[in-house]
Amino acid sequence: EPIKSYRTGQVLFDRLEVTRTDNDEDLIVWDMLAWYGGDRNRIYFKSEGENRSDDGEPAELESAELLASRLIAPFWEIQGGLGTRGSIASGAERENYLVFSLFGMAPYRFEMDNSLTVNEDGDIAVNIEAEYDIRLSQLSYLQPRLEMGAALTDAEEYDRPSGFNNVRMGLRYRYELSRELAPYIGVYWSRALGDKADRVRDQGGDESEIGVVVGVRMWF
């Protein structure tokens, strides 16, 4: 039974990594969340983004979200709030949106974060993230990870056509130096899909990417 009056919090960097791609690009990537509250009700802040080295461009914010969360079943929370994404450059036009998420652990201990966003123009997008920890020893884990993005409507202003837009699969090996600190290494593969892939090719870009990552998972 959840403890109604208990309040605590956590800051977790699930991914804080340096990436080297098959196009000889270097990236710094972060994926973090912070929360405060009890077992039933919490406030979350989530952020993901990347910065490509030596391209002269500011970091790209994939998402920054402030969410209210409610426990609706064992291991499952429903969340709702506000978010933004885009360049972090001063004065940059960012996409602001409402977000609704189903966040928790599926059977067989798959960690899920499924979200639906609606921006100021009414454009609807869906993002699915799943990861799973395979314990190799008391201190080491192998973690496969899957992420998919799709749009239910065309969002021309943000170069996001309707349909499935991208898929990303990764595999990381991490070793826990302590409960709070675990360095890791890994690889990933990502690919644009459907009309998004056609647009990337038309613009002279690569529709797929492979990368090697070195990073650390930590919380406090």
For each feature predicted by the language model, list its residue ranges.
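Transmembrane beta-barrel strands of outer-membrane/channel proteins
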Residues: 15-18, 45-49, 80-84, 114-118, ...
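Detector for outer-membrane/organellar transmembrane beta-barrel domains
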Residues: 91-155
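Outer-membrane beta-barrel initiation region
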Residues: 1-57, 70
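Repeated loop/turn-to-beta-strand initiation elements of outer-membrane beta-barrel proteins
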Residues: 39-45, 74-79, 108-114, 137-142, ...
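Residue-level signature of outer-membrane beta-barrel architecture
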Residues: 36-38, 70, 104, 116-118, ...
